[in-house]
């Protein structure tokens, strides 16, 4: 007689914990798999949330140049060392990363400088 999924689930409902552990072990050995994959997926999700709390590198993103495009271009030039044409193209293509991989304090400092000349900036 062939077993179907319902038969297996019914057996599992009535099985003792040790029987289920033995079944899992037998499945792991027979098929060369591990039940730890399901556990690590849940662990990775919780680790991901703590990683965002412990972020060490930040990107400064220019969201828009606001009303003072020329002043923002000048500030972007001084921050990045780009030429006039490159800085203008960068500012006009907002939202765009101005600097990446900065410490939190450096990113906040750049944000303040850009906001002081009228830009809308995010730190991510």
UniProtKB/Swiss-Prot annotation:
UniProt keyword terms in alphabetical order: Ribonucleoprotein, Ribosomal protein
Lineage top rank: taxon: Bacteria
GO biological process: translation
Molecular function as annotated in GO: mRNA binding; structural constituent of ribosome
Any one of the GO CC terms: cytosolic large ribosomal subunit
Database matches in SUPFAM superfamilies: ClpS-like, Ribosomal protein L7/12, oligomerisation (N-terminal) domain
Alphabetical list of Gene3D superfamilies matching this protein: 3.30.1390.10, Single helix bin
Pfam families assigned to the protein according to its UniProt record, in alphabetical order: Ribosomal_L12, Ribosomal_L12_N
Family recorded in the similarity comment: Belongs to the bacterial ribosomal protein bL12 family.
Primary role: Forms part of the ribosomal stalk which helps the ribosome interact with GTP-bound translation factors. Is thus essential for accurate translation.
UniProt-listed PANTHER family: 39S RIBOSOMAL PROTEIN L12, LARGE RIBOSOMAL SUBUNIT PROTEIN BL12M
Subunit structure: Homodimer. Part of the ribosomal stalk of the 50S ribosomal subunit. Forms a multimeric L10(L12)X complex, where L10 forms an elongated spine to which 2 to 4 L12 dimers bind in a sequential fashion. Binds GTP-bound translation factors.
Name of the protein: Large ribosomal subunit protein bL12
Organism: Borreliella afzelii (strain PKo) (Borrelia afzelii)
